[in-house]
């Protein structure tokens, strides 16, 4: 396309997400605020949380809900499992993200493995906050985006080149099913928000 040629001519990076060449890792915690503004009570939950991790988990709840029609119990289970996943990777509320590289964060495949692990290891004699059935439904719901046919759009570490000029090619995205499109646009939004707040000079 003309935008691809233009971005290459200017030394930029053209990102066609339908190609699967570039990945934005949904599980890499992004910045949702610069920490200086007063809390807006009407803002979405992702903007009202305090730490980058808690903000990002709030975003992920909306992200997963955009991808599949999860009910509240399933989303609450996903939140608990995400907290377990980040703890496993040493990502906490006090993590210094300036020392982290994209490869330091879990990817969707890791999240699916944890969900499967929790499901297959479910002990009916123990008390859990979530049911075995809910775990199974979560595993089924995220399978395609984590390890299945749609995983090429979500599963992997962020690999977008450092560039002052990025062009997001979303034309092909408009032809996909609504839930995949919404989840991918959510993911692009998280990346753009992060760059705007951490790098600046972003249009």
Question: Which role does the model predict for each range below?
Answer:
Residues 1-13, 17-203:
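P-loop NTPase motor domains
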């Amino acid at each position: 396309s003309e935008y691809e040629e233009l971005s290459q001519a200017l030394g930029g990076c053209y990102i066609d997400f339908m190609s699967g060449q570039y990945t934005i890792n949904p599980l890499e915690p992004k910045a949702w605020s610069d920490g200086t503004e007063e809390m807006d009570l009407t803002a979405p939950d992702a903007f009202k949380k305090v730490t980058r991790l808690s903000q990002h988990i709030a975003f992920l709840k909306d992200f997963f809900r955009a991808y599949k029609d999860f009910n509240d119990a399933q989303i609450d289970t996903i939140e608990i499992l995400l907290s377990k996943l980040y703890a496993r990777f040493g990502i906490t509320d006090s993590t210094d993200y300036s020392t982290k590289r994209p490869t330091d964060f879990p990817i969707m495949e890791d999240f699916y493995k944890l969900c499967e692990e929790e499901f297959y290891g479910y002990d009916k004699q123990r008390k859990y906050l979530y049911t075995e059935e809910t775990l199974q439904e979560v595993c089924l719901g995220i399978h395609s985006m984590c390890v299945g046919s749609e995983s090429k759009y979500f599963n992997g570490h962020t690999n977008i080149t450092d560039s002052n000029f990025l062009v997001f090619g979303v034309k092909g995205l408009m032809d996909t099913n609504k839930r995949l499109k919404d989840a991918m646009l959510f993911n692009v939004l998280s990346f753009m928000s992060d760059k705007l707040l951490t790098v600046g000079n972003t249009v």
